[in-house]
């Protein structure tokens, strides 16, 4: 049986001044990471979670998704995701609400899909769908059997949500495939860190001038 692919299905359509897109890029460039182009305009982006699913209690899902999002704090770029509470929404649409949800359906070999909308050079909305009808999801780091840990799948999908495509480095969180019960995605590879730093360079604050320390 082949290894399921984590991918974001590519779809484009006009929606006011926005474009719906999804990260499906693969790179032949010597640099392993791939930048999709648009970025968020603010250093913090809020998201909500609809925890309704077939496999786990709501609190376990919330904790696991938040852990996956927090994976992207393992670097010093000028960007982070911020959890803003639960949601009952069940559709992914450009509504200004960045949503993570589970759907009792399948989408080919995709374990999860990230949809994002952009206006010009800025991402304005991103939604993540876990395909709960096709795969079983687990939380934590033990007990998984033939399924996938939410933490690791979420880490990959939040990478798409911040603007990264698929890396060609097999050790990267943003590599396009993952084996069952893998726990490696929750730790960023140097390639992932380089990618997010390229999108959101660290802000350097200069020390004030004209000051002296008086002993």
Indicate residue ranges for each PLM-predicted region.
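Zinc-dependent metalloendopeptidases
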Residues: 25-206
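N-terminal Sec-pathway targeting helices
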Residues: 9-13
């Amino acid at each position: 049986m082949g290894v399921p692919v984590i991918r974001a299905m590519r779809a484009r359509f006009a929606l006011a001044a926005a474009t719906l897109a999804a990260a499906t890029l693969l790179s032949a460039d010597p640099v392993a990471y791939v930048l999709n182009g648009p970025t968020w305009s603010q250093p913090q982006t809020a998201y909500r979670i609809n925890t309704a699913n077939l496999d786990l209690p709501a609190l376990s899902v919330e904790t696991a998704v938040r852990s996956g999002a927090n994976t992207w704090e393992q670097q010093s770029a000028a960007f982070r995701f911020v959890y803003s509470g639960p949601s009952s929404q069940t559709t992914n649409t450009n509504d200004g609400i960045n949503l993570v949800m589970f759907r009792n359906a399948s989408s080919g070999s995709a374990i999860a899909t990230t949809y994002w909308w952009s206006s010009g050079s800025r991402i304005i909305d991103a939604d993540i769908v876990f395909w709960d009808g096709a795969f079983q999801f687990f939380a934590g780091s033990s007990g998984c059997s033939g399924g996938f840990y939410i933490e690791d799948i979420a880490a990959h999908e939040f990478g798409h949500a911040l603007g990264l495509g698929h890396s060609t480095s097999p050790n990267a969180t943003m590599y396009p495939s993952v084996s069952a019960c893998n726990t490696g995605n929750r730790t960023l590879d140097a390639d992932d860190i380089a990618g997010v730093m390229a999108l959101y360079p660290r802000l350097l604050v200069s020390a004030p001038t004209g000051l002296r320390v008086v002993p």
